[in-house]
A protein has these predicted regions:
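Short beta-strand/loop motif that positions the catalytic acidic residue
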Residues: 194, 199-202, 206
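Primarily recognizes the serine-hydrolase "nucleophile elbow" in alpha/beta-hydrolase
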Residues: 78, 138-145, 149-194
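Compositionally biased alpha-helical segments
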Residues: 258-333
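Short substrate-entry loop that stabilizes the transition state in hydrolases
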Residues: 54-106, 207-208
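Cap/lid segment of the alpha/beta-hydrolase catalytic domain
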Residues: 95-128
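Alpha/beta-hydrolase active-site loop
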Residues: 120-144
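A domain-start/cap signature at the N-terminus of enzymes
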Residues: 21-62, 74, 129, 265-268
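C-terminal catalytic histidine-bearing segment of alpha/beta-hydrolase fold enzymes
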Residues: 212-269
């Protein structure tokens, strides 16, 4: 294991691929967004794709897509075939930053992780990276009509490791997982915590994530459940095999399309309780929270009338309440 980790340490930094990602974008537009990450004390970027077919009245499947080490949301969402397939099939796609280019999404612990450390990074980088994914998921679930039985998680390299980790930690959320060339160095016991079917994809000539390590993970994975799939690409590398391979993306979306979160019971829609909201000038309104994108919040009075206000216009207590509501919404199955 020490040899494989050494290889990973030397080669895992994912080369920026912006110039190589020739546009295969669907008619919908990739949006560059930010939201205020309170615990981090700054705004964090994420990328979002909304298909032209999206309608609020029809819940849409959602793919959460995690980038690799040294990359960012705007690169991974432009992997060839991603938005094309999303448009064809009606998927929302969101790519969180995971705080920065090297957060590891919590897969290497709450601190800075083994690889990619940079002076100035917060001591709790892994914790912030994990929370950023959940924050963005909460924002999208609040703003859009998302099919809760069809929320998927996929990632490349560092993002593949994050997919395995978050897939286990929040196993009730995901209908399927797709780790691609996963940079995962933790215990394989994590497989026992994963409930969703997995499709692991790797190239047999990958020099960043040793294929022997992925094969061992895949072997343990298939022993744990017959629903998991392992795809090894002959001659496949760590880069173009994934970001310049629309045929692979078609296979991945085919896999996602076949998976739905099971065991959900029909229940009456939950309605948030009424509470008193105050703005900074002291004016009060009794209402319930409806949605928030992290910058604005929509609230509804008892009579059904809705209001959308800037989050910053509310009292500190109400801002904290909305932030907590967003975080809790992200982890609801």
């Amino acid at each position: 294991m020490s040899k494989t980790i050494s290889l990973l340490c030397r080669a895992l930094v994912f080369v920026s691929v912006t110039s190589s990602l020739s546009a295969q974008e669907a008619p919908g537009k990739i949006q560059k967004r930010t939201y205020p990450f309170k615990e981090a004390g700054k705004d964090i970027e994420y990328a979002l794709y909304v298909p032209e077919s999206y309608r609020k009245a029809t819940p849409a499947p959602l793919l959460v897509l995690l980038h690799g080490l040294g990359s960012n949301p705007h690169e991974v969402i432009r992997y060839q075939g991603v938005t094309v397939e999303a448009e064809k099939r009606g998927y929302l796609v969101v790519a969180p930053f995971g705080y920065n280019e090297r957060g590891w999404y919590g897969s290497q612990g709450k601190g800075q992780g083994l690889f990619g450390r940079t002076p100035g990074d917060p001591e709790n980088l892994g914790e912030l990276s994990e929370k950023d994914v959940l924050n963005v998921l909460g924002i999208i679930r609040n703003e859009f009509s998302v099919d809760s039985a069809r929320i998927y998680l996929a990632g490349h390299s560092m993002g593949g490791g994050g997919t395995i980790y978050l897939g286990a930690e929040y196993s009730d959320i995901w209908a399927a997982l797709v780790p691609m060339a996963p940079g995962y160095t933790g215990s394989f016991d994590i497989i026992e915590k994963i409930k969703a079917p997995m499709m692991v994809v790797a190239g047999d000539e990958d020099t960043a994530v040793p294929i022997q390590m992925v094969r061992l993970f895949a072997q343990k994975m298939k022993q744990a459940s017959g629903t998991h799939v392992y795809k090894e690409i002959a001659g496949g590398n760590h880069g173009t095999t994934f970001y310049r391979n629309p045929e692979l993306m078609t296979e991945i979306f085919d896999f996602l399309d076949s998976k739905v979160l099971r065991g959900e019971e029909e229940v009456e829609p939950f309605q948030e309780p009424l509470r008193i909201f105050r703005n900074k000038s002291g004016k009060k309104i009794e209402a319930r929270i409806v949605s928030s994108d992290g910058r604005k919040v929509t609230i509804e009075r008892k009579d059904g009338r809705t209001f959308t206000v800037k989050l910053s216009s509310l009292s500190e207590a109400d801002q904290d309440y909305v932030s907590t509501w967003i975080a809790e919404s992200a982890t609801e199955p």
